[in-house]
Amino acid sequence: MAFWNLGTLKLEQFRPGIMSKAQIGGNLIMVCMQIDQGKEDTGHEHPFDQCGIVLEGNIEMFVDQERRILNANECYFIPAGQRHGWKTF
């Protein structure tokens, strides 16, 4: 799928409290996620780049040793192979 409309995009349950839709290409993953407060991913990595935008709320993310709280309208980029994770509050 080349184009997404976030207003009509159908999300599926990824884990309890996390709804998502992912599109994986050869070198990049694009993901739309709705994450309940109090959820956490303690860290993982994958063989493709990932980037995203926080649309609302806030999330604490780490990429390798860098940690930051992101708010609405802030973006992130995760290079392939970098350990990363997040938590919502």
Which functions belong to the PLM regions below?
Residues M1-N27:
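A short, N-terminal "cap"/entry segment at the start of jelly-roll beta-barrel domains
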Residues Q34-D36, H46-M61:
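Short, conserved beta-strand element in jelly-roll/cupin
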Residues T42, C51, E66-R68:
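Short, surface-exposed secondary-structure edge patches
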Residues P16, V31-H46:
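Conserved short histidine dyad/triad with adjacent acidic residue
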Residues A80-F89:
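Ligand-binding loop in jelly-roll beta-barrel domains
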Residues N58-E60, R67, R83:
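Structural motif
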Residues E66-A80:
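Short acidic-glycine-tyrosine-enriched beta hairpin
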